[in-house]
């Protein structure tokens, strides 16, 4: 069962399964038009830049204080999605999330500062699916993912993420600190 975080500090084993970036948007700004054709690039490692995003990604330096400097998606959710639709030939990258990770309930990280492989993040919000999920994956994917389409986060320290096993360490539960104040 994936780690779920509820107001306490802890660490857990996780695994970074895949890393993706794209230099341009294929869906944002394309409503009512065909999607763009910018390739999704799978990486073995990626540079995280404080307050800016992933070096080379379309959202790098997108906007000041942007909540989606990096996006995470659970490998377990992707597996359920594939099983539900009977689709095995599409990679997790079609969902346009940056980091595919296993071993953690990502939505439990909303409001938390956490660290993976020495890089610190703040979980900001659910990365809600858009209509393009039905185009990129299969009709009905948006509805299937409406409650669990990933995590948006801010990057709080420079560093590099790489594929493989890692520790996810909760640095602080920001929402618990605010509600207890």
Specify the residue positions occupied by each region the protein language model found.
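Well-ordered alpha/beta subsegment
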Residues: 151-181
